[in-house]
Amino acid sequence: MSVEGGTTLKVTDESLAQAARVIRDGGLVVIPTDTVYGVACDPRNKAAIDRIYRLKRRPRYKALQVLLASTDQLDELGLDLPSPLNRLSAAFLPGAFSPIAVARPDCTLETLADTADGRPGTQGIRIPNSALCLAILKATGPLAASSANRSGDESAQTVQEAVDAFGSEVDLYLDGAPTQGHVSSTVVKADPYARDGIEILREGVIAQNVIRKALHLNGGGLGA
């Protein structure tokens, strides 16, 4: 089955297979997440990523997240979660927790945030707390994603709001019913010189004290 731009399909086994083909061919798919609808593509396809930035009119300095079905997918992307982010991820994912992964030399992502001092690039990741979104990610593989709206506009909580924003400029829309709305994730990176070995870049719904407490549960120190 071929897809014309702007096609909307309910989430079924058939539409998931179609979404996987669109992503593999360098297209854009709008998907429901655990917060809002997002526009997504293959994070290894530069042309598709450029298309998201143009579509959203998003400044290039604003990085895209990479959505995963499991941290097991990090290795295939050439990413590592430095300690203690690996422990925090085990505690808070799936959910509103966005650790900053570090790229290995074999990383093939086109979404990496560059560092000015020659250190390895970095990538914010997330595992959505939604069985439906995880099913999509298992079908498509990891996705580079951003909210399905023009930059500065309201985020889409229904597939129709995403269609109204982008129309036929997106290849396929997956309709997963209304989402709950925007929830800020807590963004954390590893920093061996900072308190507890982490720097909290953005405090979201998971409070800073909850993050830090998790590092010391069961007597676990930074080396645990």
Where are the language model's segments positioned?
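Active-site-adjacent structural elements in enzyme catalytic cores
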Residues: M1-A224
